[in-house]
From Swiss-Prot:
UniProt-annotated binding residues for Mg(2+): 276
Gene: pheS
Protein name per the record: Phenylalanine--tRNA ligase alpha subunit
Lineage per the UniProt record: Bacteria, Pseudomonadati, Pseudomonadota, Gammaproteobacteria, Moraxellales
Cofactors that this protein relies on: Mg(2+)
The protein's enzyme class: ligase
Record field: catalytic activity: tRNA(Phe) + L-phenylalanine + ATP = L-phenylalanyl-tRNA(Phe) + AMP + diphosphate + H(+)
Keywords from the UniProt entry: Aminoacyl-tRNA synthetase, ATP-binding, Cytoplasm, Ligase, Magnesium, Metal-binding, Nucleotide-binding, Protein biosynthesis
HAMAP family in the cross-refs: Phe_tRNA_synth_alpha1
Organism (species): Psychrobacter arcticus (strain DSM 17307 / VKM B-2377 / 273-4)
A GO cellular component annotation in the UniProt record: cytoplasm
Subcellular locations according to the entry: Cytoplasm
Length: 351
């Protein structure tokens, strides 16, 4: 872009008298035409603004002539007023038109410099994938669905009854201390396990019942191996002939199918208020150490009774496991918090 210094030099205009009454129409027309030509030479918006001030500002010849109108006779005022109005209008119109033209030129230059070269190769599309916790959940569900179980879900905001009372955990029971619970009030809370789904299912359905209950649960705990929100998958089977031997076989087969290898599985006696007998399940790792992976047991007769099921006729077993725990073992991850930090560098490894 060229920026000639002479474009704002008013010496290019004809020299006229500073006294208005010494001018005639021809001189003013010549002045106006010269000003319009000067305006057309300006190729820079900033210089055009400078020229606007010089041609129409307080110190311009045009303003100086206009100030003398009060000294003229009425007839001269009419004559010179018409001439000066024509001069000012033409100069203002020329300035406005040139500014619009320069703005268009500047915009086109900017658009040209920012244009997209469509001949360049495009960036490849990025594919998303499931979260590792979701993939592990689906892997677990796939096994149990093939084994004849249905998937059941329930509310995450639960009543104290479904989360504790119906599961044989009364308000005075010491097992309550095992649950650092998020309470809304004395009656409602964030569920600490997915066991309430089992209660709701048994209340609404007659045996035989075969369900798994995956979902989010909440406990007031947070460290390298615990999170205030995590995922559980629990299972329940109630029939007229459910046995602990059947439970052991189901869990052992599930663990070997999940980890896709033969495992040494150990069942240790334990205690849960809602099952009797109860057991913790361990597997032997490659270093010869036992790893606790889940809990299980035969459904306590009182729990069946609470749900309106005849405990003399039916028996059942239940089991539960932490999905993040299985994900950590499956992928070799030692920090549970990585699953919840949304770090793409971590998550993209599972695509």
């Amino acid at each position: 872009m060229t920026t000639p210094a002479a474009t704002t030099d008013l010496s290019a205009l004809p020299t006229l008298s500073s006294e208005l009454n010494e001018l005639n129409e021809a001189q003013l027309i010549e002045f106006t035409s010269a000003a319009e030509a000067l305006i057309l030479q300006v190729s820079d918006v900033r210089l055009l603004q400078d020229l606007r001030v010089q041609l129409t500002g307080k110190k311009s010849p045009l303003t100086g002539w206009s100030k003398q109108m009060g000294k003229l006779s009425n007839d001269d005022k009419k004559t010179y007023g018409g001439w000066l109005h024509e001069v000012r209008s033409r100069i203002q119109d020329a300035l406005t038109a040139q500014q619009q033209q320069l703005e268009v030129v500047a915009l086109n230059a900017k658009l040209a410099s920012e244009s997209i070269d469509i001949t360049l190769p495009a960036r490849g599309g990025q594919k998303g994938h499931l979260h590792p916790v979701t993939m592990i959940t689906q892997r677990m569900q796939q096994y149990f669905i093939q084994a004849g179980f249905n998937v059941a879900t329930g509310p995450e905001v639960e009543s104290d009854y479904y989360n504790f009372e119906a599961l044989n955990i009364p308000s005075h029971h010491p097992a309550r201390a095992m649950h650092d619970t998020f309470y809304f009030d004395a009656h409602y809370l964030l569920r600490t396990h997915t066991s309430p789904v089992q209660i709701r299912t048994m209340e609404k359905n007659e045996p035989p019942i075969r369900i798994i209950c995956p979902g989010r649960v909440y406990r007031n705990d947070s460290d390298q191996t615990h999170s205030p929100m995590f995922h559980q998958l629990e299972g329940l089977m109630v029939t007229e002939s459910s046995t602990f031997a059947e439970l052991k076989g189901l869990i052992s087969e599930f663990l070997e199918a999940f980890f896709a290898k033969e495992l040494t599985v150990r069942f240790r006696p334990s205690f849960f208020p809602f099952t009797e007998p109860s057991a913790e399940v361990d597997i032997l790792d490659d270093n010869g150490k036992w790893l606790e992976v889940m809990g299980c047991g035969m459904v306590h007769p009182q729990v069946l009774t609470n749900c309106g099921i005849d405990a003399e006729k039916y028996t059942g077993f239940a089991f539960g496991m932490g999905i993040e725990r299985f994900a950590m073992l499956y992928y070799g991850i030692d920090d549970l918090r990585l699953f919840f930090q949304n770090d793409v560098r971590f998550l993209k490894q599972f695509g």
